[in-house]
A protein has these predicted regions:
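N-terminal secretory signal peptides and thylakoid transit peptides that target proteins
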Residues: 1-11
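Extended, highly charged
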Residues: 42-309, 313-499, 519, 523
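Short, leucine-enriched amphipathic alpha-helices that occur as contiguous helical runs
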Residues: 499-507, 529
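Short capping segments at the starts of secondary-structure elements
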Residues: 508-518
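Short amphipathic alpha-helical interaction segments
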Residues: 527-538
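A short, conserved structural fragment
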Residues: 540-550
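Short, cationic-aromatic polyanion-contact patches
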Residues: 550-559
Length: 559
């Protein structure tokens, strides 16, 4: 609970004074002029105006999404819980978990919100098997980004500056036993690319270093790394803001890798206008309906400080790295803000936020490439147990010889992170481990159907590379050789279906052409097949019955 203390200045003056100091500390980052009422301890509380009624700030709010999850998708823990116990509750849990009283401050915290395909699909309002198609559809929309005032933005209902902006007071927990420190793991980063004027959005982890400092991992190639390196080369701090507590649709947008301004991308995936507001200590615009925002800058010293180790999204530890340092200048939040943590790494990799988000993102990227490489892709699945990117399954209908191999090559070209590609015929469900295993066992000959490619750019986090960046990739053609998939031996046995054409007699049915036994039962409405057996026996005895190579019955033609 916040203690109020007497202010020696007018509320407006105090508000401006509280915001000027962190702006100067941030090496000249621009501060905003704010109309606010100020409580003690550097906290600014904004009052919404009537204009806020024009925008629905709850439609894409994380809290509302979590509140509407059914019981099979969320576990609610109302009792107080120590931060040290959070990770154990989340590990291997198929549900999202909502902690109502986490840590000494008894704050609300939710974890593993995007740790299942069904929950992400629920955020998009579609069934899980329609998720990637819906994302592809929304990417074609014309988005709208609407800027709102600070007074209207729920994210500015509470503003903490100066000493009161304290990262150690947030419900941030140690996630893995050998992690270097507690990590903020669900942070969406927002920066401005000066070269293009675009807002860049991504996902970062933030290792706590103190009350107002974290490490930020930029070792992997990314737009943010390129933007930061240019800023550091000019000896300038890079303004950056992190959103913590975002709707699954926004999180999906953050992991997409498209060469576009990514604020309109967020709006496109929402299929609704995106309300944004300018931050209080920099000029970055962030979603006005977020739960928390951490404002600040990356200092220009470059990859100067140790960061890590950390349990990475592939299920192993990443080593200590040299990374930039983030300096906090303000914390803004809703009055009833819900903090968020993402599950990353561990033995239950397929249930983690990062693996599921990565998987859906990979599927969308790969589909776009497949549409160019082959005429008819049917389904794509990036297995979450491989981190959502290493093992990829593709179902397609082959139109010409070589389609399967073209698909394999397209997958490798579309994403350097894809390591193994499995291509199957339409009768195989790519989401079924059992069916994929069966296809590998019965339709694959290694000397004929294995495609190996070496010297390929790969993900450095792959432990099998032993620290390298170049590796090999494998394609598994699990399709029937072109033109042979319709033969009897390639068909999958299934219970008979009796919906064939009806005939006045068995002889009339056989006169039309070869028929399977089930077709003959349908032809005369037989419910047990006994009369069919007897009738066929009579024809056989009369020397009139023949069978073709697939076992279908037909009447022998007169010589």
């Amino acid at each position: 609970m916040l203690r109020r203390r007497q202010l020696l200045t007018t509320p407006a003056a105090a508000g401006e004074q509280a915001l000027e100091k962190p702006a100067r500390d941030a090496a000249g980052l621009q501060s905003a002029s704010l109309r606010a009422s100020v409580t003690a301890m550097g906290i600014v509380e904004r009052k919404a105006t009537a204009a806020a009624q024009a925008t629905d700030f709850d439609r894409f709010r994380l809290r509302r999404f979590v509140e509407n999850l059914p019981a099979e998708e969320i576990e609610i823990r109302r009792e107080p819980i120590a931060l040290a116990d959070i990770a154990d509750v989340l590990e291997g849990n198929a549900k999202a978990v909502w902690f109502h009283a986490a840590g000494p401050e008894r704050q609300e915290l939710v974890g593993s919100v995007t740790g299942s395909r069904s929950r992400i699909a629920r955020g998009f309002g579609v069934a899980p098997n329609a998720l990637t198609a819906e994302i592809r559809r929304r990417l074609q929309s014309k988005p709208e980004v609407t800027e709102v005032s600070s007074a209207e933005a729920p994210i500015h209902e509470v503003v903490l500056t100066g000493e009161d902006a304290d990262l150690t007071k947030l419900p941030v927990h140690l996630q893995h036993g050998e992690d270097g420190a507690p990590f903020i793991s669900a942070a969406m980063d927002f920066t401005i690319d000066p070269a293009r004027g675009w807002t860049n959005v991504g996902f970062r982890r933030m290792m706590l270093r103190g009350r107002q400092e974290t490490g930020v991992d930029l070792n992997s190639p990314s737009d943010l790394r390129a933007i930061y390196e240019a800023s550091a080369a000019a000896d300038k701090p890079l303004p950056i803001s992190f959103v913590v507590g975002a709707h699954p649709v926004d999180q999906m947008a953050a992991v997409m890798r498209l060469p576009v301004d990514e604020l309109p991308l967020l709006a496109a995936l929402r299929a609704a206008p995106l309300p944004v507001v300018k931050c209080v200590t920099n000029d970055i615009r962030v979603p006005a309906d977020a739960e928390w925002v951490l404002e600040g800058y990356l200092d220009p010293r470059g990859f100067a400080e140790s960061e890590g180790p950390y349990g990475e999204f592939l299920g192993y530890y990443g080593s200590v790295k040299r990374n930039p340092v983030f300096h906090l200048t303000a914390i803004t939040r809703r009055r009833d803000a819900l903090f968020q943590t993402s599950t990353i790494g561990g033995r239950s990799l397929g249930l983690t936020d990062t693996a599921v988000l990565n998987g859906v993102r990979t599927e969308v990227m790969i589909w776009r490439a497949l549409e160019t490489a082959v005429r008819e892709p049917l389904a794509v699945y990036a297995t979450t147990s491989s981190g959502g990117m290493f093992n990829l399954r593709v179902s397609l209908r082959q139109r010409v010889p070589g389609d399967a191999r073209n698909a394999i090559a397209a997958c490798f070209g579309a994403s350097p992170n894809v390591k193994n590609v499995f291509v199957v015929d339409p009768d195989i469900d790519v989401f079924s481990d059992a069916q994929m295993d069966w296809a590998l066992a019965t339709r694959f000959q290694p000397d004929r159907d294995l495609v190996l490619m070496s010297g390929m750019r790969s993900l450095p986090l792959d432990p099998s590379l032993n620290g390298g960046r170049i590796g090999a990739k494998a394609g598994f053609d699990l399709t029937w050789p072109f033109g042979t998939g319709n033969r009897l031996e390639a068909r999958v046995p299934a219970p008979p279906v009796y919906n064939g054409k009806r005939f006045p007699s068995l002889a009339a049915a056989l006169a039309e052409g070869p028929k399977y036994f089930a077709d003959l039962m349908s032809a005369v409405g037989s419910r047990d097949g006994r009369e069919i057996v007897l009738a066929l026996d009579e024809l056989r005895a009369a020397g009139r019955l023949e069978r073709d190579g697939d076992g279908r019955y037909f009447i022998k033609r007169d010589e």
